[in-house]
């Protein structure tokens, strides 16, 4: 029973998402027993009526006390509410079935806010304009937009429950060096170069191209003029691709047999694979007691013949181009459910990602994303940038300058002479004069002249309040220019994009290159790394997740427990039980890291659960540990999609090591409890070293 709502301070609904159970509870609450023929209010109106007291009380407390509540539960703990104010929009997440904790709900809100930024760019900084974008006056457009974000939230919830990479928020590579190299060459020659040398590209510049097999990254290539893509942005792109072309095997256990058939909120069920209330050692359920008594199959402990000293869990094919057939036989069940066919391509989309423009960092630069499906589960993604991208840098710098000026004005009254002497103001004035002269828009010209008259007048300088109002007006007009140039002219609205025949050419060439590999890739994506490769050296190890937080990449054995695809643990309750343990460990590790703990080791039933976070230099030498910051319960959630916690943690650690490159790593492990703890810790160190060496395999 779940709900997400975005509303204004006046309780106007800007977006909502509910599951069927929550809608049913609303129907019962607003049902008219006296006149059954009377039509019920629209779902949007029901939500507004239900949550108006919460919204108004929260905003009133913020206005009167400069503080408000961020989380509360209803009587008897039936419903849990989490609230967060982003700008002028209040985000509310509700759970009524005890399957989501406060941290889960807060993470969902931050992810939704991040998805808004990816889709609307810097328009999100202006409350008035983002309200217009989220609630267009045309009803059909509004329904289409809301259904898009409802579908994204449903996809995110599904992937977080079923895919390890979304559970820990990191990129998972499909490990096969020779195939990766082949794909990189193909991306360079047949995608990036083919597009950039085409006379019909219309000024669009191909920057990045990558191949996905389900949610795993096979290969990635960037042009020489492109800046690096943040791991958080790349993970968000994988989410968008999975929303467009969901993997059948990850959606097969959902309540709706075909979740893509209808994308409205009425058809977006969300199930949780684990309960946050049963993660402690004493919180075992009856199901846990039963599965604790299972003995692991004997063949699980019998390592297969080692494929070679270089192997780190994946078999490397040295010669011949195509994999041997015995590799395909090991997962024939996977192939039966993933019969390749060619989905219909989606249209190009305008998205906003952080990048460098003219050697300067710029947040939320407009890109165009082309998702070209090769076969079911295998997708080619191309990112291009239009010639107008430098305008985004100029607008971003100007809006940032006015935001800093607003901050200074709010700190205290500034006399005119003192304001003029600020280096920030002089630089901002020079940049704005140049921009206004080049743009020539009458409205922003008059507003800028009005601002200069108040800010730089020696005889009659404006007050701080007047300058603040003028700053806000200028920022809104700059934001409107940004919206006009990058949202109104988006490819989906008829804006410029690559011609269709060029997209078809790229798609066809990549299909030809990978035709012999498609079946192998679909199998490999489900059994990327096998535990058998590690059991000889690490007896008692059941599962692990290793994450390089500097690059945002993870390594973990496959963990599938659906009815049609499975890992080495099989398809029964044992696989589901181990998966539940791993997901609970991920959540518990985050909670302890939030409180400043970087090491966690505890016994739960027949298992030892452990978590380690540490820092190294580029040579792989472990660095001295520090006390990591302790965060409040309502802080930005730990991960990449909600706020990139690890990038901030690396900056925090690097303050005392300005001349040394610092890297951050995490290891989560599940062992049998018969293993002594000192041996477990020793194994963790050896496992981390082995995985560090394996992760040196280049992806780019």
UniProtKB/Swiss-Prot annotation:
The lineage of its organism: Eukaryota, Metazoa, Chordata, Craniata, Vertebrata. Ubiquitous. [DE]-X(4)-L-L repeats lie at residues 45-51, 147-153, 516-522, 644-650. Residues 249-317 are annotated as: Disordered. Residues 264-274 have a biased composition (Polar residues). The gene is HPS1. GO terms for molecular function: guanyl-nucleotide exchange factor activity; protein dimerization activity. Keywords: Albinism, Disease variant, Guanine-nucleotide releasing factor, Hermansky-Pudlak syndrome, Repeat, Sensory transduction, Vision. It is linked to Hermansky-Pudlak syndrome 1: A form of Hermansky-Pudlak syndrome, a genetically heterogeneous autosomal recessive disorder characterized by oculocutaneous albinism, bleeding due to platelet storage pool deficiency, and lysosomal storage defects. This syndrome results from defects of diverse cytoplasmic organelles including melanosomes, platelet dense granules and lysosomes. Ceroid storage in the lungs is associated with pulmonary fibrosis, a common cause of premature death in individuals with HPS. GO terms for cellular component: BLOC-3 complex; cytoplasm; cytoplasmic vesicle; cytosol; lysosome. Component of the BLOC-3 complex, a complex that acts as a guanine exchange factor (GEF) for RAB32 and RAB38, promotes the exchange of GDP to GTP, converting them from an inactive GDP-bound form into an active GTP-bound form. The BLOC-3 complex plays an important role in the control of melanin production and melanosome biogenesis and promotes the membrane localization of RAB32 and RAB38. A motif (Melanosome targeting signal) lies at residues 698-700. Residues 275-286 have a biased composition (Low complexity). It comes from Homo sapiens. It holds the Pfam family Fuz_longin_3. This is BLOC-3 complex member HPS1. InterPro entries: FUZ/MON1/HPS1_longin_1 (IPR043972), FUZ/MON1/HPS1_longin_2 (IPR043971), FUZ/MON1/HPS1_longin_3 (IPR043970), HPS1 (IPR026053).
């Amino acid at each position: 029973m779940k709900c997400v709502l975005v509303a204004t301070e006046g309780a106007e609904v800007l977006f909502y998402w509910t599951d069927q159970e929550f809608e049913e509870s609303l129907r019962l609450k607003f049902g008219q027993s006296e006149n059954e023929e009377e039509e019920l209010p629209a779902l949007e109106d029901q939500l507004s009526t239900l949550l108006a007291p919460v919204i108004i009380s929260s905003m009133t407390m913020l206005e009167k006390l400069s503080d408000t509540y961020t989380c509360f539960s209803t009587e008897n703990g039936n419903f849990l509410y989490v609230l967060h104010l982003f700008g002028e929009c209040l985000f509310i997440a509700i759970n009524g079935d005890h399957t989501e904790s406060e941290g889960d709900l807060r993470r969902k809100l931050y992810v939704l806010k991040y998805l808004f930024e990816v889709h609307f760019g810097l328009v999100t900084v202006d409350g008035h304009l983002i309200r217009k974008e989220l609630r267009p006056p045309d009803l059909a457009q509004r329904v289409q937009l809301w259904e898009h974000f409802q579908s994204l939230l449903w996809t995110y919830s599904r992937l977080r429950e079923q895919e390890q990479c979304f559970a820990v928020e990191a990129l998972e590579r499909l490990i096969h060096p020779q195939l990766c190299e082949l794909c990189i060459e193909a991306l360079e020659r047949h995608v990036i170069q083919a597009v950039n040398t085409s006379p019909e590209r219309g000024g669009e510049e191909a920057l990045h191209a990558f191949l996905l097999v389900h949610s795993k990254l096979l290969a990635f290539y960037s042009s020489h003029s492109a800046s690096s893509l943040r791991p958080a942005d790349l993970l968000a792109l994988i989410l968008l691709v999975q929303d467009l072309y969901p993997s059948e095997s990850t959606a097969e256990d959902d309540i709706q047999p075909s979740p893509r058939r209808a994308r409205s909120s009425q058809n977006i069920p969300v199930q949780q694979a684990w309960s946050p209330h049963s993660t402690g050692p004493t919180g075992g359920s009856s199901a846990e007691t039963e599965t604790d008594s299972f003995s692991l199959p004997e063949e699980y402990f019998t390592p297969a013949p080692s494929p070679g000293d270089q192997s780190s869990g994946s078999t490397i094919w040295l010669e011949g181009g195509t994999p041997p057939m015995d590799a395909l036989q090991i997962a024939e069940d996977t192939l039966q459910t993933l019969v390749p066919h060619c989905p219909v391509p989606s249209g190009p989309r305008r998205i906003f990602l952080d990048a460098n423009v003219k050697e300067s960092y710029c947040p939320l630069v407009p890109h165009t994303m082309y998702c070209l499906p090769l076969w079911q589960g295998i997708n080619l993604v191309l990112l291009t940038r239009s010639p107008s991208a430098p305008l985004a840098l100029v607008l971003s710098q100007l809006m940032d300058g006015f935001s800093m000026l607003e901050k200074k004005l709010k700190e205290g009254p500034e006399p005119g002479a003192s304001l003029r002497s600020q280096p920030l103001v002089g630089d901002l004035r020079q940049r704005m004069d140049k921009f206004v002269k080049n743009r020539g828009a009458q409205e922003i010209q008059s507003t800028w002249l009005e601002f200069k008259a108040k800010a730089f007048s020696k005889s009659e300088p404006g007050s701080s309040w007047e300058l603040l109002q003028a700053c806000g007006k200028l920022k809104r007009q700059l934001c409107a220019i940004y919206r006009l140039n990058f949202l109104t002219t988006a490819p989906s609205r008829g804006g410029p994009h690559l011609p269709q025949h060029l997209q078809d050419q790229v798609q066809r060439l990549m299909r030809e290159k990978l035709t012999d590999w498609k079946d192998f890739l679909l199998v490999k994506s489900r059994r990327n790394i096998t535990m058998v490769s590690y059991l000889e050296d690490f007896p008692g190890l059941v599962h692990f997740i290793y994450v390089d937080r500097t690059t945002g990449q993870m390594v973990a054995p496959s963990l599938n427990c659906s009815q049609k695809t499975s890992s080495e643990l099989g398809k029964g309750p044992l696989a589901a039980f181990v998966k539940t343990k791993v997901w609970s460990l991920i959540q518990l590790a985050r909670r302890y890291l939030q409180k400043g703990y970087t090491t966690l080791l505890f016994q739960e039933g027949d298992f030892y659960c452990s978590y380690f976070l540490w820092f190294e230099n580029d040579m792989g030498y472990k660095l001295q540990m520090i006390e990591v910051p302790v965060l409040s319960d309502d802080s930005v959630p730990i991960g990449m999609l909600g706020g990139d916690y690890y990038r901030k943690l690396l900056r925090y650690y690097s303050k005392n090591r300005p001349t040394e490159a610092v890297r951050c790593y995490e290891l989560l492990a599940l062992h049998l409890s018969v293993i002594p703890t000192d041996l477990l810790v020793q194994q963790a160190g050896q496992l981390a070293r082995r995985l560090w060496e394996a992760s040196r395999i280049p992806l780019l």
